Amino acid sequence: MQESKYQELQKQAEKSVKESMTLFQDWPNKGVGFQDISNLFLCYDKFSDVLDYYEHRFSDVDLVVGLEARGFILGTAFAQRMKLPMMMIRKKGKLPGPCFRESYKKEYGTDEFEVQEKALSKVVVKPSKKYHVLIMDDILAPGGTMAASIELTKKVLINNGIKDFKISTSLISSIKVLNGKEKIYEKYNDVSVDIIIEM
């Protein structure tokens, strides 16, 4: 893809995200600023701008992973557009059957994520190609959620016989002062982090 086209799509996606975002102070707890992107999903054209950008940025992806909850919307929409499988990573107790589990810290507490151990048992993998996985979520804060998701994704890939893979991550926005992007890069030097807008 031509660099000018890429930059054009990136700028349009950034503009649409800025116009859609609302900041709520002291929510869900005092001292926390919550970046709400709900309006993005209410505006077909703005959401489409984001998907257009992702379509060009991640044209070689084989599997999409969506994180509960807004990552489900982003992941499903992108996977459908690209005709790709979409795997869910959910909060503890939401998935049936044997699951891998990872705990993580967030800016206002702790939580746990789970993924089904055999989530990819029906996915067809091309043996000649490195399997490219894209993990999608809305906001990157301290990075704990994404780090736990990367660990779970690695576990489920290996458990389902996929050993040659690379992982990319995409987020609508980040809270820059929390250094989530830097923490991910520090822990995983082989994982890319794509953020449309850093606040």
Curated annotation (Swiss-Prot):
The reply to whether Transferase figures as a keyword in the UniProt entry is yes
Q: Which UniProt keywords apply?
A: Cytoplasm, Glycosyltransferase, Purine salvage, Transferase
Q: Where in the cell is it found?
A: Cytoplasm
State the species of origin: Dictyostelium discoideum
Reactions this protein catalyses: AMP + diphosphate = 5-phospho-alpha-D-ribose 1-diphosphate + adenine
Protein family: Belongs to the purine/pyrimidine phosphoribosyltransferase family.
Q: Which PANTHER family match?
A: ADENINE PHOSPHORIBOSYLTRANSFERASE, PHOSPHORIBOSYLTRANSFERASE DOMAIN-CONTAINING PROTEIN
Stored CDD domains? PRTases_typeI
Q: Which gene encodes it?
A: aprt
| Gene Ontology terms describing biological process | adenine salvage; AMP salvage; purine ribonucleoside salvage
Top EC category:
transferase
The pathway to which it is assigned is: Purine metabolism; AMP biosynthesis via salvage pathway; AMP from adenine: step 1/1
Q: InterPro entries attached here?
A: Adenine_PRTase, PRibTrfase_dom, PRTase-like
Question: What Pfam families does UniProt report for this protein, alphabetically?
Answer: Pribosyltran
Under the subunit heading, UniProt states: Homodimer.
Q: What is its EC number?
A: 2.4.2.7
Recorded protein name is Probable adenine phosphoribosyltransferase
A GO CC term attached to the entry: cytoplasm
List the molecular function annotations (GO) for this entry. Answer: adenine phosphoribosyltransferase activity
Biological role stated in the UniProt entry = Catalyzes a salvage reaction resulting in the formation of AMP, that is energically less costly than de novo synthesis.
